[in-house]
Protein backbone atom coordinates (compact mmCIF):
# COMPACT_ATOMS: atom_id res chain seq x y z
CA UNK A 1 0.00 0.00 0.00
CA UNK A 2 1.35 3.40 -0.93
CA UNK A 3 1.51 5.86 1.93
CA UNK A 4 0.96 9.53 1.20
CA UNK A 5 3.72 11.90 2.22
CA UNK A 6 3.25 15.38 3.62
CA UNK A 7 3.14 18.11 1.03
CA UNK A 8 6.38 19.71 2.26
CA UNK A 9 8.15 16.34 1.86
CA UNK A 10 6.82 15.94 -1.67
CA UNK A 11 7.98 19.41 -2.68
CA UNK A 12 11.49 19.60 -4.02
CA UNK A 13 13.25 22.05 -1.75
CA UNK A 14 15.17 24.73 -3.69
CA UNK A 15 18.92 24.93 -3.43
CA UNK A 16 20.26 26.89 -0.46
CA UNK A 17 21.29 30.50 -0.96
CA UNK A 18 24.89 29.79 0.06
CA UNK A 19 25.18 26.89 -2.39
CA UNK A 20 23.54 28.88 -5.19
CA UNK A 21 25.75 31.94 -4.72
CA UNK A 22 28.95 29.90 -4.40
CA UNK A 23 28.14 27.88 -7.52
CA UNK A 24 27.15 30.94 -9.54
CA UNK A 25 30.15 33.01 -8.48
CA UNK A 26 32.47 30.04 -8.97
CA UNK A 27 31.09 29.49 -12.46
CA UNK A 28 31.54 33.17 -13.33
CA UNK A 29 35.04 33.24 -11.84
CA UNK A 30 36.01 30.04 -13.61
CA UNK A 31 34.69 31.32 -16.94
CA UNK A 32 36.40 34.69 -16.60
CA UNK A 33 39.69 33.23 -15.40
CA UNK A 34 39.59 30.55 -18.10
CA UNK A 35 39.17 33.19 -20.80
CA UNK A 36 41.91 35.29 -19.20
CA UNK A 37 44.16 32.22 -19.02
CA UNK A 38 43.60 31.34 -22.67
CA UNK A 39 44.18 34.89 -23.87
CA UNK A 40 47.15 35.47 -21.59
CA UNK A 41 48.69 32.08 -22.37
CA UNK A 42 48.38 32.76 -26.08
CA UNK A 43 50.07 36.11 -25.62
CA UNK A 44 52.79 34.62 -23.39
CA UNK A 45 53.42 31.86 -25.96
CA UNK A 46 53.77 34.39 -28.75
CA UNK A 47 55.96 36.65 -26.63
CA UNK A 48 58.23 33.76 -25.57
CA UNK A 49 58.56 32.49 -29.13
CA UNK A 50 59.18 36.00 -30.48
CA UNK A 51 61.68 36.72 -27.72
CA UNK A 52 63.72 33.62 -28.48
CA UNK A 53 63.50 34.29 -32.20
CA UNK A 54 64.69 37.89 -31.72
CA UNK A 55 67.55 36.67 -29.55
CA UNK A 56 68.59 34.20 -32.23
CA UNK A 57 68.28 36.92 -34.90
CA UNK A 58 70.52 39.20 -32.85
CA UNK A 59 73.18 36.49 -32.69
CA UNK A 60 72.75 35.81 -36.41
CA UNK A 61 73.13 39.49 -37.29
CA UNK A 62 76.23 39.76 -35.16
CA UNK A 63 77.79 36.82 -36.98
CA UNK A 64 76.70 38.20 -40.36
CA UNK A 65 78.51 41.46 -39.60
CA UNK A 66 81.68 39.66 -38.39
CA UNK A 67 84.75 40.28 -40.64
CA UNK A 68 86.00 36.76 -39.91
CA UNK A 69 82.78 35.28 -41.32
CA UNK A 70 82.98 37.46 -44.43
CA UNK A 71 86.60 36.54 -45.03
CA UNK A 72 85.96 32.88 -44.36
CA UNK A 73 83.29 32.76 -47.06
CA UNK A 74 86.02 33.75 -49.57
CA UNK A 75 87.78 30.43 -48.90
CA UNK A 76 86.83 26.82 -49.15
CA UNK A 77 84.49 25.48 -46.39
CA UNK A 78 87.13 23.28 -44.76
CA UNK A 79 89.72 26.07 -44.74
CA UNK A 80 87.55 29.04 -43.75
CA UNK A 81 87.82 28.80 -39.93
CA UNK A 82 84.10 29.64 -39.67
CA UNK A 83 83.37 26.31 -37.92
CA UNK A 84 85.37 27.24 -34.83
CA UNK A 85 83.75 30.65 -34.51
CA UNK A 86 80.22 29.28 -35.02
CA UNK A 87 80.63 26.46 -32.52
CA UNK A 88 82.02 28.79 -29.89
CA UNK A 89 79.03 31.11 -30.26
CA UNK A 90 76.58 28.16 -30.36
CA UNK A 91 77.82 26.68 -27.14
CA UNK A 92 77.96 30.04 -25.40
CA UNK A 93 74.27 30.78 -26.26
CA UNK A 94 73.00 27.19 -25.81
CA UNK A 95 71.76 26.95 -29.41
CA UNK A 96 70.88 23.82 -31.36
CA UNK A 97 72.98 24.80 -34.37
CA UNK A 98 74.68 27.66 -36.19
CA UNK A 99 75.11 27.06 -39.89
CA UNK A 100 76.84 29.48 -42.23
CA UNK A 101 76.32 28.90 -45.97
CA UNK A 102 77.43 30.51 -49.18
CA UNK A 103 75.08 31.51 -51.97
CA UNK A 104 74.92 27.89 -53.18
CA UNK A 105 73.66 26.78 -49.71
CA UNK A 106 76.89 24.92 -49.02
CA UNK A 107 77.57 24.67 -45.30
CA UNK A 108 80.67 26.33 -43.80
CA UNK A 109 79.74 25.28 -40.26
CA UNK A 110 77.61 22.64 -38.55
CA UNK A 111 77.52 20.92 -35.10
CA UNK A 112 78.33 17.73 -36.99
CA UNK A 113 81.59 18.63 -38.76
CA UNK A 114 81.24 15.91 -41.40
CA UNK A 115 78.29 17.83 -42.88
CA UNK A 116 80.45 20.86 -43.73
CA UNK A 117 80.54 21.36 -47.49
CA UNK A 118 77.13 19.72 -47.97
CA UNK A 119 73.98 21.63 -49.06
CA UNK A 120 71.69 23.08 -46.38
CA UNK A 121 68.53 21.03 -45.77
CA UNK A 122 65.21 22.89 -45.99
CA UNK A 123 63.44 25.33 -48.27
CA UNK A 124 63.08 27.90 -45.47
CA UNK A 125 66.57 29.23 -46.41
CA UNK A 126 65.37 30.48 -49.80
CA UNK A 127 64.09 33.83 -48.52
CA UNK A 128 67.43 34.51 -46.86
CA UNK A 129 69.26 33.65 -50.12
CA UNK A 130 67.12 36.35 -51.70
CA UNK A 131 68.17 38.92 -49.11
CA UNK A 132 65.28 38.61 -46.59
CA UNK A 133 65.47 37.63 -42.95
CA UNK A 134 63.22 34.69 -42.14
CA UNK A 135 61.88 32.84 -39.08
CA UNK A 136 60.47 29.33 -39.47
CA UNK A 137 59.86 26.06 -37.69
CA UNK A 138 61.32 23.10 -39.52
CA UNK A 139 63.27 19.91 -39.01
CA UNK A 140 66.80 19.35 -40.26
CA UNK A 141 69.27 16.59 -39.46
CA UNK A 142 69.23 17.30 -35.71
CA UNK A 143 65.68 17.96 -34.40
CA UNK A 144 62.53 20.02 -34.81
CA UNK A 145 63.70 23.58 -34.35
CA UNK A 146 62.82 27.24 -34.44
CA UNK A 147 65.12 28.49 -37.22
CA UNK A 148 66.15 32.05 -38.09
CA UNK A 149 68.00 33.16 -41.24
CA UNK A 150 70.00 36.35 -41.89
CA UNK A 151 71.79 37.25 -45.15
CA UNK A 152 75.53 38.08 -45.13
CA UNK A 153 76.85 41.01 -47.17
CA UNK A 154 80.44 42.00 -48.05
CA UNK A 155 81.90 45.49 -47.95
CA UNK A 156 80.26 46.32 -51.28
CA UNK A 157 76.86 45.30 -49.92
CA UNK A 158 76.78 42.25 -52.11
CA UNK A 159 75.22 39.17 -50.57
CA UNK A 160 77.76 36.42 -50.13
CA UNK A 161 76.01 33.98 -47.80
CA UNK A 162 73.48 33.21 -45.03
CA UNK A 163 73.66 32.64 -41.26
CA UNK A 164 71.11 30.07 -40.00
CA UNK A 165 70.58 29.58 -36.27
CA UNK A 166 68.34 26.92 -34.74
CA UNK A 167 66.69 26.74 -31.32
CA UNK A 168 65.47 23.31 -30.26
CA UNK A 169 61.66 23.46 -30.29
CA UNK A 170 61.38 21.43 -27.09
CA UNK A 171 63.32 24.16 -25.33
CA UNK A 172 60.91 26.78 -26.66
CA UNK A 173 57.99 24.66 -25.51
CA UNK A 174 59.58 24.21 -22.08
CA UNK A 175 59.92 27.94 -21.59
CA UNK A 176 56.31 28.43 -22.69
CA UNK A 177 55.16 25.74 -20.24
CA UNK A 178 57.16 27.35 -17.45
CA UNK A 179 55.37 30.61 -18.14
CA UNK A 180 52.07 28.71 -18.33
CA UNK A 181 52.45 27.33 -14.82
CA UNK A 182 52.86 30.83 -13.42
CA UNK A 183 49.59 31.73 -15.15
CA UNK A 184 47.87 28.63 -13.78
CA UNK A 185 48.99 29.40 -10.23
CA UNK A 186 47.77 32.97 -10.63
CA UNK A 187 44.39 31.69 -11.85
CA UNK A 188 44.10 29.25 -8.94
CA UNK A 189 44.99 32.01 -6.49
CA UNK A 190 42.33 34.22 -8.06
CA UNK A 191 39.79 31.37 -7.72
CA UNK A 192 40.70 30.93 -4.06
CA UNK A 193 40.37 34.64 -3.31
CA UNK A 194 37.06 34.69 -5.19
CA UNK A 195 35.69 31.74 -3.21
CA UNK A 196 36.76 33.29 0.09
CA UNK A 197 35.10 36.55 -0.92
CA UNK A 198 31.98 34.63 -1.95
CA UNK A 199 31.78 32.88 1.43
CA UNK A 200 32.07 36.25 3.19
CA UNK A 201 29.39 37.68 0.89
CA UNK A 202 27.07 34.75 1.66
CA UNK A 203 27.51 35.28 5.41
CA UNK A 204 26.72 38.99 5.05
CA UNK A 205 23.64 38.22 2.93
CA UNK A 206 22.41 35.61 5.40
CA UNK A 207 22.78 38.13 8.21
CA UNK A 208 20.85 40.76 6.24
CA UNK A 209 18.13 38.19 5.45
CA UNK A 210 17.93 37.03 9.09
CA UNK A 211 19.21 33.59 8.13
CA UNK A 212 16.26 32.93 5.81
CA UNK A 213 16.50 31.19 2.47
CA UNK A 214 14.98 32.88 -0.63
CA UNK A 215 12.11 30.38 -0.84
CA UNK A 216 11.38 30.99 2.86
CA UNK A 217 11.30 34.75 2.22
CA UNK A 218 8.95 34.16 -0.72
CA UNK A 219 6.69 31.99 1.45
CA UNK A 220 6.64 34.58 4.24
CA UNK A 221 5.84 37.33 1.75
CA UNK A 222 2.93 35.36 0.28
CA UNK A 223 1.64 34.54 3.76
CA UNK A 224 1.92 38.19 4.77
CA UNK A 225 0.01 39.30 1.69
CA UNK A 226 -2.71 36.70 2.31
CA UNK A 227 -2.96 37.72 5.97
CA UNK A 228 -3.13 41.44 5.19
CA UNK A 229 -5.85 40.97 2.61
CA UNK A 230 -7.89 38.56 4.74
CA UNK A 231 -8.25 40.68 7.89
CA UNK A 232 -11.11 43.16 8.17
CA UNK A 233 -9.03 45.85 9.84
CA UNK A 234 -7.44 48.45 7.61
CA UNK A 235 -3.64 48.43 7.57
CA UNK A 236 -1.42 51.27 6.31
CA UNK A 237 2.37 51.12 6.63
CA UNK A 238 4.75 54.07 6.17
CA UNK A 239 8.54 54.30 5.99
CA UNK A 240 10.78 56.55 8.09
CA UNK A 241 9.89 59.52 5.86
CA UNK A 242 6.17 59.01 6.29
CA UNK A 243 5.68 57.72 2.75
CA UNK A 244 2.98 55.05 2.42
CA UNK A 245 4.55 51.73 1.42
CA UNK A 246 1.65 49.34 2.00
CA UNK A 247 -2.14 49.47 2.10
CA UNK A 248 -4.43 46.45 2.26
CA UNK A 249 -7.85 45.97 0.67
CA UNK A 250 -9.77 46.77 3.85
CA UNK A 251 -7.93 50.10 4.19
CA UNK A 252 -8.63 50.94 0.55
CA UNK A 253 -12.33 50.31 1.12
CA UNK A 254 -12.50 52.32 4.34
CA UNK A 255 -10.57 55.22 2.77
CA UNK A 256 -12.45 55.01 -0.55
CA UNK A 257 -9.08 54.66 -2.27
CA UNK A 258 -8.55 52.71 -5.47
CA UNK A 259 -5.02 52.69 -6.83
CA UNK A 260 -6.05 51.81 -10.37
CA UNK A 261 -8.51 54.72 -10.49
CA UNK A 262 -7.22 57.44 -8.16
CA UNK A 263 -3.43 57.11 -8.17
CA UNK A 264 -0.85 55.22 -10.14
CA UNK A 265 1.56 55.73 -7.27
CA UNK A 266 1.23 55.97 -3.50
CA UNK A 267 2.66 59.49 -3.38
CA UNK A 268 -0.76 61.15 -3.46
CA UNK A 269 -2.03 58.83 -0.73
CA UNK A 270 1.11 59.54 1.32
CA UNK A 271 0.34 63.26 1.25
CA UNK A 272 -3.32 62.82 2.20
CA UNK A 273 -2.52 60.19 4.85
CA UNK A 274 -0.02 62.47 6.60
CA UNK A 275 -2.78 65.08 6.91
CA UNK A 276 -5.21 62.56 8.43
CA UNK A 277 -2.84 60.72 10.79
CA UNK A 278 0.15 62.48 12.33
CA UNK A 279 2.83 59.78 12.47
CA UNK A 280 5.72 62.22 13.00
CA UNK A 281 5.64 61.76 16.78
CA UNK A 282 5.62 57.98 16.42
CA UNK A 283 8.54 58.10 13.96
CA UNK A 284 10.46 60.58 16.11
CA UNK A 285 9.93 59.23 19.64
CA UNK A 286 8.63 55.72 19.01
CA UNK A 287 5.59 56.42 21.22
CA UNK A 288 2.56 54.36 20.16
CA UNK A 289 -0.74 56.16 19.67
CA UNK A 290 -3.68 53.99 20.65
CA UNK A 291 -7.46 54.12 20.32
CA UNK A 292 -7.60 57.48 18.56
CA UNK A 293 -10.82 58.51 16.86
CA UNK A 294 -10.56 60.19 13.48
CA UNK A 295 -13.16 61.05 10.87
CA UNK A 296 -12.45 60.26 7.23
CA UNK A 297 -15.11 60.98 4.63
CA UNK A 298 -17.99 60.87 7.15
CA UNK A 299 -16.67 57.68 8.74
CA UNK A 300 -15.64 57.47 12.38
CA UNK A 301 -12.51 55.31 12.58
CA UNK A 302 -10.73 53.89 15.62
CA UNK A 303 -7.00 53.91 14.86
CA UNK A 304 -3.83 52.57 16.51
CA UNK A 305 -0.34 53.53 15.31
CA UNK A 306 2.82 51.76 16.47
CA UNK A 307 6.47 52.15 15.39
CA UNK A 308 8.40 49.54 13.41
CA UNK A 309 11.96 48.94 14.61
CA UNK A 310 14.94 47.17 13.11
CA UNK A 311 17.97 46.66 15.37
CA UNK A 312 16.55 49.29 17.70
CA UNK A 313 16.19 51.90 14.94
CA UNK A 314 12.74 53.19 13.93
CA UNK A 315 12.30 52.44 10.23
CA UNK A 316 8.60 53.17 9.87
CA UNK A 317 5.16 52.87 11.44
CA UNK A 318 2.02 50.79 10.99
CA UNK A 319 -1.50 52.08 11.49
CA UNK A 320 -4.42 49.70 11.97
CA UNK A 321 -7.96 50.98 12.03
CA UNK A 322 -11.55 49.87 11.94
CA UNK A 323 -14.84 51.58 11.32
CA UNK A 324 -16.03 52.46 14.83
CA UNK A 325 -19.54 52.76 13.49
CA UNK A 326 -19.38 49.09 12.55
CA UNK A 327 -18.09 48.20 16.02
CA UNK A 328 -20.97 50.08 17.60
CA UNK A 329 -23.41 48.35 15.29
CA UNK A 330 -22.10 44.98 16.40
CA UNK A 331 -22.34 46.01 20.05
CA UNK A 332 -25.86 47.27 19.59
CA UNK A 333 -26.81 44.13 17.71
CA UNK A 334 -25.48 42.14 20.65
CA UNK A 335 -27.36 44.39 23.06
CA UNK A 336 -30.55 43.64 21.14
CA UNK A 337 -29.98 39.91 21.45
CA UNK A 338 -29.19 40.28 25.16
CA UNK A 339 -32.34 42.36 25.66
CA UNK A 340 -34.35 39.71 23.84
CA UNK A 341 -32.90 36.99 26.06
CA UNK A 342 -33.52 39.07 29.20
CA UNK A 343 -37.10 39.68 28.14
CA UNK A 344 -37.69 35.99 27.58
CA UNK A 345 -36.07 35.17 30.93
CA UNK A 346 -38.20 37.73 32.73
CA UNK A 347 -41.35 36.45 31.06
CA UNK A 348 -40.43 32.88 31.91
CA UNK A 349 -40.23 33.79 35.61
CA UNK A 350 -43.53 35.62 35.35
CA UNK A 351 -45.23 32.67 33.70
CA UNK A 352 -43.71 30.31 36.27
CA UNK A 353 -45.34 32.35 39.01
CA UNK A 354 -48.65 32.23 37.17
CA UNK A 355 -48.35 28.46 36.80
CA UNK A 356 -47.86 28.23 40.56
CA UNK A 357 -51.06 30.24 41.06
CA UNK A 358 -52.92 27.92 38.68
CA UNK A 359 -51.58 24.86 40.50
CA UNK A 360 -52.69 26.31 43.86
CA UNK A 361 -56.20 27.02 42.59
CA UNK A 362 -56.39 23.45 41.27
CA UNK A 363 -55.45 22.07 44.69
CA UNK A 364 -58.07 24.29 46.31
CA UNK A 365 -60.60 23.19 43.67
CA UNK A 366 -61.48 26.85 43.08
CA UNK A 367 -62.40 26.23 39.49
CA UNK A 368 -64.39 29.44 39.01
CA UNK A 369 -61.47 31.60 40.22
CA UNK A 370 -59.11 29.46 38.10
CA UNK A 371 -61.15 30.11 34.96
CA UNK A 372 -61.24 33.84 35.62
CA UNK A 373 -57.49 33.93 36.28
CA UNK A 374 -56.61 32.04 33.10
CA UNK A 375 -58.85 34.24 30.97
CA UNK A 376 -57.37 37.38 32.48
CA UNK A 377 -53.81 36.12 31.99
CA UNK A 378 -54.49 35.20 28.36
CA UNK A 379 -56.05 38.58 27.68
CA UNK A 380 -53.11 40.40 29.27
CA UNK A 381 -50.62 38.35 27.22
CA UNK A 382 -52.55 39.04 24.05
CA UNK A 383 -52.67 42.73 24.81
CA UNK A 384 -49.04 43.11 25.89
CA UNK A 385 -46.99 40.46 24.14
CA UNK A 386 -49.15 38.63 21.66
CA UNK A 387 -50.16 41.78 19.84
CA UNK A 388 -46.54 42.97 19.79
CA UNK A 389 -45.26 39.69 18.33
CA UNK A 390 -48.07 39.76 15.80
CA UNK A 391 -47.02 43.20 14.58
CA UNK A 392 -43.23 42.91 14.91
CA UNK A 393 -41.95 39.96 12.84
CA UNK A 394 -38.27 40.49 13.70
CA UNK A 395 -37.49 38.52 16.89
CA UNK A 396 -34.57 40.81 17.68
CA UNK A 397 -36.63 43.99 17.38
CA UNK A 398 -39.51 42.37 19.30
CA UNK A 399 -37.23 41.31 22.15
CA UNK A 400 -35.66 44.76 22.15
CA UNK A 401 -39.06 46.48 22.43
CA UNK A 402 -40.20 44.08 25.18
CA UNK A 403 -37.07 44.91 27.19
CA UNK A 404 -37.69 48.65 26.70
CA UNK A 405 -41.36 48.23 27.74
CA UNK A 406 -40.22 46.48 30.91
CA UNK A 407 -37.57 49.15 31.56
CA UNK A 408 -40.14 51.93 31.16
CA UNK A 409 -42.49 50.08 33.53
CA UNK A 410 -39.71 49.71 36.11
CA UNK A 411 -39.13 53.48 35.92
CA UNK A 412 -42.84 54.20 36.42
CA UNK A 413 -43.53 55.21 32.83
CA UNK A 414 -45.49 53.65 29.98
CA UNK A 415 -44.07 52.60 26.61
CA UNK A 416 -46.77 51.89 24.03
CA UNK A 417 -46.41 50.34 20.57
CA UNK A 418 -49.00 51.96 18.33
CA UNK A 419 -51.77 49.55 17.33
CA UNK A 420 -51.27 50.41 13.65
CA UNK A 421 -47.61 49.39 13.72
CA UNK A 422 -46.46 46.69 11.28
CA UNK A 423 -42.84 45.61 10.86
CA UNK A 424 -41.75 42.67 8.67
CA UNK A 425 -38.38 41.07 9.34
CA UNK A 426 -35.44 42.39 7.32
CA UNK A 427 -32.77 40.37 5.60
CA UNK A 428 -30.22 43.15 6.20
CA UNK A 429 -28.28 43.10 9.46
CA UNK A 430 -27.22 46.72 8.87
CA UNK A 431 -30.86 47.82 8.75
CA UNK A 432 -31.75 45.89 11.93
CA UNK A 433 -28.70 47.24 13.76
CA UNK A 434 -29.45 50.81 12.67
CA UNK A 435 -33.08 50.51 13.81
CA UNK A 436 -31.99 49.16 17.22
CA UNK A 437 -29.48 52.02 17.55
CA UNK A 438 -32.10 54.58 16.59
CA UNK A 439 -34.94 53.26 18.77
CA UNK A 440 -32.62 52.60 21.70
CA UNK A 441 -31.20 56.10 21.62
CA UNK A 442 -34.55 57.84 21.15
CA UNK A 443 -36.33 55.77 23.84
CA UNK A 444 -33.50 56.23 26.35
CA UNK A 445 -33.47 59.97 25.65
CA UNK A 446 -37.23 60.05 26.23
CA UNK A 447 -36.95 58.11 29.51
CA UNK A 448 -34.25 60.49 30.74
CA UNK A 449 -36.35 63.48 29.70
CA UNK A 450 -39.38 62.15 31.62
CA UNK A 451 -37.25 62.05 34.75
CA UNK A 452 -37.88 60.19 38.02
CA UNK A 453 -41.48 61.38 38.44
CA UNK A 454 -43.74 58.49 37.26
CA UNK A 455 -46.62 58.72 34.85
CA UNK A 456 -44.81 59.64 31.65
CA UNK A 457 -45.81 58.12 28.34
CA UNK A 458 -43.79 57.16 25.28
CA UNK A 459 -45.33 55.88 22.08
CA UNK A 460 -43.59 54.12 19.20
CA UNK A 461 -45.02 53.74 15.71
CA UNK A 462 -43.42 51.47 13.09
CA UNK A 463 -44.97 51.49 9.65
CA UNK A 464 -43.56 49.65 6.61
CA UNK A 465 -44.55 50.61 3.08
CA UNK A 466 -42.97 49.98 -0.35
CA UNK A 467 -39.48 49.19 0.90
CA UNK A 468 -39.33 51.99 3.48
CA UNK A 469 -39.77 51.91 7.24
CA UNK A 470 -41.34 54.98 8.84
CA UNK A 471 -40.69 55.27 12.55
CA UNK A 472 -42.08 57.78 15.06
CA UNK A 473 -41.11 58.13 18.72
CA UNK A 474 -43.19 60.50 20.89
CA UNK A 475 -42.96 61.46 24.52
CA UNK A 476 -44.85 63.93 26.73
CA UNK A 477 -41.72 65.19 28.44
CA UNK A 478 -40.39 68.74 28.82
CA UNK A 479 -39.44 69.06 25.13
CA UNK A 480 -36.40 70.68 23.50
CA UNK A 481 -35.48 74.34 23.82
CA UNK A 482 -35.97 76.32 20.57
CA UNK A 483 -32.32 77.45 20.54
CA UNK A 484 -31.12 73.83 20.52
CA UNK A 485 -33.57 72.05 18.25
CA UNK A 486 -31.84 73.12 15.01
CA UNK A 487 -28.51 71.74 16.28
CA UNK A 488 -29.77 68.71 18.19
CA UNK A 489 -28.08 66.29 15.74
CA UNK A 490 -24.70 68.03 15.91
CA UNK A 491 -21.96 66.26 17.82
CA UNK A 492 -21.57 67.72 21.32
CA UNK A 493 -25.05 69.30 21.44
CA UNK A 494 -27.19 67.87 24.26
CA UNK A 495 -30.01 68.75 26.64
CA UNK A 496 -28.42 66.57 29.36
CA UNK A 497 -25.41 68.62 30.32
CA UNK A 498 -21.73 68.66 29.33
CA UNK A 499 -19.76 65.75 27.87
CA UNK A 500 -22.89 64.41 26.16
CA UNK A 501 -24.39 64.82 22.69
CA UNK A 502 -22.85 61.90 20.81
CA UNK A 503 -25.83 59.54 20.51
CA UNK A 504 -28.07 61.57 18.19
CA UNK A 505 -25.11 62.51 15.98
CA UNK A 506 -24.27 58.81 15.63
CA UNK A 507 -27.93 57.97 14.95
CA UNK A 508 -28.11 60.60 12.21
CA UNK A 509 -24.86 59.33 10.64
CA UNK A 510 -26.04 55.70 10.60
CA UNK A 511 -29.48 56.59 9.24
CA UNK A 512 -28.00 58.72 6.45
CA UNK A 513 -25.40 56.03 5.65
CA UNK A 514 -28.34 53.73 4.86
CA UNK A 515 -29.90 56.43 2.67
CA UNK A 516 -32.53 57.45 5.23
CA UNK A 517 -33.43 60.62 7.09
CA UNK A 518 -34.30 61.80 10.60
CA UNK A 519 -36.16 64.89 11.80
CA UNK A 520 -37.59 66.26 15.06
CA UNK A 521 -40.48 68.40 16.25
CA UNK A 522 -40.89 69.67 19.79
CA UNK A 523 -42.98 72.05 21.83
CA UNK A 524 -41.42 72.84 25.18
CA UNK A 525 -43.44 71.51 28.10
CA UNK A 526 -45.80 69.49 25.86
CA UNK A 527 -44.12 66.91 23.59
CA UNK A 528 -41.14 65.81 21.54
CA UNK A 529 -41.56 63.75 18.35
CA UNK A 530 -38.83 62.18 16.18
CA UNK A 531 -39.47 61.04 12.60
CA UNK A 532 -37.15 58.43 11.08
CA UNK A 533 -37.24 56.95 7.59
CA UNK A 534 -34.87 54.17 6.46
CA UNK A 535 -34.82 51.57 3.65
CA UNK A 536 -36.16 48.18 4.80
CA UNK A 537 -35.83 44.85 2.97
CA UNK A 538 -39.13 43.54 4.28
CA UNK A 539 -40.38 42.16 0.97
CA UNK A 540 -37.13 40.28 0.33
CA UNK A 541 -37.24 38.62 3.78
CA UNK A 542 -40.78 37.36 3.14
CA UNK A 543 -39.99 35.69 -0.18
Curated annotation (Swiss-Prot):
Record-linked InterPro entries: HATPase_C_sf, His_kinase_dom, PAS, PAS-like_dom_sf, PAS_fold, sCache_3, Sensor-like_sf, Sig_transdc_His_kin-like_C
Matching Gene3D superfamilies: 1.10.287.130, Histidine kinase-like ATPase, C-terminal domain, PAS domain
UniProt catalytic activity: ATP + protein L-histidine = ADP + protein N-phospho-L-histidine
UniProt membrane topology term: Multi-pass membrane protein
GO molecular function: ATP binding; identical protein binding; phosphorelay sensor kinase activity; protein histidine kinase activity
Entry keywords, A to Z: ATP-binding, Cell inner membrane, Cell membrane, Kinase, Membrane, Nucleotide-binding, Phosphoprotein, Transferase, Transmembrane, Transmembrane helix, Two-component regulatory system
Effect of residue 248 to A/D/G: Causes constitutive active state of the kinase, leading to constitutive expression of a target gene, without addition of C4-dicarboxylates
PROSITE patterns: HIS_KIN (PS50109), PAS (PS50112)
Topological region Periplasmic: 42-181
Residue span(s) of domain PAS: 212-323
Database matches in NCBIfam families: PRK11086.1
Subunit annotation: Homodimer. Interacts with DctA and DcuB. DctA/DcuS and DcuB/DcuS complexes are present both in the absence or presence of fumarate.
Name listed for the protein in its UniProt record: Sensor histidine kinase DcuS
The organism of origin for this protein: Escherichia coli (strain K12)
Amino acid sequence: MRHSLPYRMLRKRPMKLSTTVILMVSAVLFSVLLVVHLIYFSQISDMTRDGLANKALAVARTLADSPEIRQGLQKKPQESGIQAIAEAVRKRNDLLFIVVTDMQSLRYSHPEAQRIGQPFKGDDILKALNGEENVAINRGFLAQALRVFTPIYDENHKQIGVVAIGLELSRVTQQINDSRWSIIWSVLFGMLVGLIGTCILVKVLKKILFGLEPYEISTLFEQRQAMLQSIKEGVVAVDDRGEVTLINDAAQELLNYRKSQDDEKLSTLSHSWSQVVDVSEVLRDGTPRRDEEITIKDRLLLINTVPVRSNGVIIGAISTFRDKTEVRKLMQRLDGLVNYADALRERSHEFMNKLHVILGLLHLKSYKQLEDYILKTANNYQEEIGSLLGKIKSPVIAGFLISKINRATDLGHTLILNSESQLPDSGSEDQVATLITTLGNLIENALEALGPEPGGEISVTLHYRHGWLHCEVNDDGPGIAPDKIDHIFDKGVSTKGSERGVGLALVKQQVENLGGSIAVESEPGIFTQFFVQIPWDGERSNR
